[in-house]
Design a protein with these regions (language model features):
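N-terminal ligand-binding/catalytic initiation module
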Residues: 1-158, 398-399, 406, 432-456, ...
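Glycine-rich adenosine-cofactor-binding loop
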Residues: 66-78, 83, 167-171, 181-207
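Anion-binding alpha/beta catalytic cores of soluble intermediary-metabolism enzymes, centered on
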Residues: 85, 137-184, 407-410, 417-689, ...
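A short, aliphatic-rich alpha-helical micro-motif
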Residues: 127, 185, 253-254, 274-277, ...
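Adenosine-phosphate binding glycine-rich loop
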Residues: 157, 161-162, 181-184, 287-393, ...
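NAD(P)-binding Rossmann-fold cofactor-contacting core
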Residues: 193, 209-237
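Rossmann-like adenosine-cofactor binding region
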Residues: 237-306, 311-313
């Protein structure tokens, strides 16, 4: 490790506070009553319930989502036997990966005990605390005995990740690699370098899937493992000992091998050995940090080889984070008493299948220009693929149920998968009523920037989720090329329509109609013709106007107001309103907050603010949320008398006259809007109850500043919008920072709006 990396790692672990984990309360502890409920005397109630029924612990404590990462530090990743305390940073790191990727809480438990039986007693005694045990960095052969004994003694999952995590990922890679080169698992010959925990577990899993044991040859530090090589050979090694045919070295047995599985050390496999392997060999060089052979060296002599390593700087990384968070997620969610072979095999197949799916936008962003389409350079998913949790955890949970180890079976798997999706997409629960309604009657939605990669990823999701009938504006050749490059599985003419923005035969009709609509707004025939040819937002808007599309999304490129100046004059305002407005939603840990007007009106009048407020309340109801509106000002219930405060008071009068049932109050400070006790100190009889969820600002500056400050200050917050309100057709203008998920969300909202449009 170079000095710069070393110092960066030390600083990372020391600042701003030592270590990588902490315990955070999930209940409020702000009052004496809170303390009485959390501890004495109130805590006695759940204790007595658990005494009567131990399963009640899953209802009243955090046990159901708590895993122990346990180690004695005898085989710490690449560092060897450094002891339990020195291995603590690794165990903390494992804990944060559980939390990051699967939302599982972890206590790291470092046990200073080398005697396997004493270690087993310590861990077994912890069963009341945890719902799962992840054994970590325990040397072989003791790790086999420890895991076996704990599995027999404990009634919760015990999983040695160094064995089974590596085995699950490697097996998935081998299955997919063989599929690429068109070989059968039952026919191939495999040579293994290393006979430790990971290697043994890999072989066991492959044999369970159909690899023939007689086609496996294992080499350890002493050479080929053959029968009667030595007295008292470990059972795990003896199980794979071959007949003695005189071959003693890796070089002797590699000739003609289809697969090399390396779980040993650096530079074990040479180029000369690789040359002797069978057609299209599969090489898993998993030693870290330096593999048995570097991929460039293997490729120099065998360009037909498919290569996996444990490193992130080469394709096909075998990384245990692809597995352990999600296999535990599935196990915990059904109250599994073990992680059995059926569950491991389910994880193997789920991981293997995900590599065949279309490319995820999150993965594409993380890995730049890498080709992530299934093939020699991509036979296993990337660790940051957000779909891992929704593919692996349900497969594992179902396998647990089918194999009889689930104590809390899942009744509704669709609902379970949807809940897991909320972990990936924070807007999922918020958007649920919109998605459900959109699926009932998908509408034609034109996406004006159809060549954009985010739009193409969004189109894939829209098609997969059945939310809309997308129409992409762009050059067909560019769209097709990018779909192929991105590894998407959508087809023009089948899943979506393309409008060629360079040569669509309808363009003469488009610009003629655009001219007729805009000729009294300073647009000449020549300008109309040029606009249709050069501006994809104009094309999309004309399509909606002509009834060739039901709704439109634009704005992933360019300035908001450039798009607004196209759509508003063309469509006008909807019936009954004389202005438009924009609203953004912030999904914060404290609750959902909507802010208006963030994009349209610089300094709206009271009449305009009243219309914006009423439209915002209507939009919020679409999400299944009852609006609670606060009109914000630097004045707090009449504390100041100035034009902006008067404007908000007048707005309140106008809104109450038109919607007396709406829960609204103002003008008020921001803290009074969000904290009821602060508001009640000033205005005890305020009709606004609880925290306001719609914040109407006096002008665009206040709205935009507030929105952006809240957006960046909350690391856990996500956004939806901008929602354009008041325009006569379902159209939404996004911003250049819009993510794929935000595009999907806004298309779904546009579909729902189009469903309720008058014919």
């Amino acid at each position: 490790m170079d000095e710069q990396l070393k110092q960066s790692a030390l600083d990372f672990h020391e600042f701003p506070v030592p270590g990588k984990i902490q315990v955070s309360p999930t209940k409020p502890l702000a009052t004496q009553r809170d303390l009485a409920l959390a501890y004495s005397p109130g805590v006695a109630a759940p204790c007595l319930e658990i005494e009567k029924d131990p399963l009640a612990a899953y209802k009243y404590t955090a046990r159901g989502n708590l895993v122990a990462v346990v180690s004695n530090g005898t085989a710490v990743l690449g560092l060897g036997n450094i002891g339990a305390l020195a291995g603590k940073p690794v165990m903390e790191g494992k804990g944060v990966l559980f939390k990051k990727f699967a939302g599982i809480d972890v206590f790291d438990i470092e046990v200073d005990e080398l005697d396997p039986d004493k270690f087993i007693n310590v861990v077994a005694a912890l069963e009341p605390t945890f719902s799962g045990i992840n054994l970590e960095d325990i040397k072989a052969p003791e790790c086999f005995y420890i895991e076996q004994q704990l599995r027999e003694r404990m009634n919760i999952p015990v999983f040695h990740d160094d064995q089974h995590g590596t085995a699950i990922i490697s097996t998935a890679a081998i299955l997919n690699g063989l599929r690429v080169v068109e070989k059968n698992l039952s026919d191939v010959r495999m040579v293994v370098s290393g006979a430790g925990a990971a290697a043994i577990a890999c072989m066991n899993l492959l044999v369970a899937l159909g690899m023939q044991k007689h086609n496996i040859v294992v080499c350890d530090s002493k050479g080929v493992i053959y029968k009667d090589r030595e007295p008292n050979m470990a059972e795990t090694k003896a199980a794979y000992a071959v007949e003695d045919d005189g071959k003693r070295t890796l070089d002797d047995v590699i000739d003609g091998a289809d697969i090399f599985l390396g779980c040993s050390g650096p530079k074990v496999l040479t180029q000369e050995m690789v040359k002797k392997m069978a057609r299209a060999p599969l090489i898993l060089a998993l030693a870290n940090p330096e593999p048995e052979i570097l991929p460039p060296l293997a490729k120099q002599v065998r360009d037909d080889a498919i290569i996996c390593t444990g490193r992130s700087d080469y394709p096909n990384q075998v990384n245990n984070v692809l597995c352990f968070p999600f296999i535990f997620r599935g196990a915990l969610d059904v109250g599994a008493t073990a992680i059995n072979e059926e569950m491991k095999l389910a994880a193997v197949h789920a991981i293997a299948e995900l590599a065949h799916a279309e490319q995820s936008e999150v993965v594409a962003s993380a890995y730049g220009d890498q080709d992530l389409s299934f093939g020699p350079e991509y036979i296993i998913p990337k660790p940051f693929d957000p779909r891992l949790i929704v593919k692996i955890a349900p497969a594992v949970a179902k396998a647990a149920m089918d194999s009889g180890v689930a104590t809390r079976p899942i009744a509704d798997f669709d609902a379970y998968i949807e809940k897991l999706s909320e972990f990936v997409y924070k807007t999922n629960l918020f958007m649920k009523p919109i998605f459900s309604q959109a699926r009932k009657e998908p509408k034609r939605v034109v996406l004006a920037e159809g060549e954009e990669t985010r739009v193409l990823h969004a189109t894939q999701e829209l098609v997969s989720l059945g939310l809309a009938k997308p129409i992409l504006v762009g050059r067909p050749s560019v769209i097709e090329m990018r779909i192929q490059k991105l590894g998407l599985q959508i087809k023009a003419g089948v899943d979506f329509e393309i409008v060629n923005n360079e040569s669509d035969p309808r363009f003469k009709e488009y610009w003629s109609e655009y001219y007729q609509l805009m000729k009294r707004r300073g647009i000449t025939q020549e300008q109309a013709q040029r606009a249709v040819i050069s501006n994809t937002t104009v094309i999309g808007a004309i399509m909606v106007h002509r009834g060739e599309a039901d709704a439109m999304i634009c704005g992933t490129i360019g300035e908001y107001h450039d798009h607004y100046r196209v759509v508003q004059p063309l469509f006008g305002y909807r019936d009954g309103v004389s202005t438009a407005g924009a609203m953004n939603a912030l999904l914060l840990p404290s609750g959902n907050t909507f802010i208006a007007d963030t994009y349209v009106n610089h300094d709206p009048s009271p009449e305009e603010l009243a219309e914006i407020t009423l439209m915002a309340a209507e939009s919020v109801r679409r999400f299944g949320i009852e609006p609670r509106v606060a009109l914000l000002s630097h004045s707090n219930f009449g504390s100041a008398d100035c034009p902006s405060a008067s404007k908000m008071r007048k707005t309140l009068e106008l809104v109450k006259a038109r919607a007396p049932e709406l829960m609204i109050d103002g003008e008020m400070h921001g803290d009074a809007a969000l904290v009821e006790s602060i508001r009640n100190d000033r205005m005890p009889d305020s009709p606004l109850k609880g925290a306001a969820n719609i914040l109407v600002m006096p002008n665009m500056e206040a709205a935009r500043i507030s929105y952006n400050l809240l957006r960046v200050s909350s690391s856990e917050g996500v956004t939806v919008g901008p929602v354009l309100m008041g325009v006569a057709k379902p159209v939404h203008i996004l911003t250049p920072i819009a993510s794929v998920r935000r595009i999907v969300n806004m298309v779904a909202l546009a579909v729902v709006e189009a469903q309720t449009e008058p014919l």
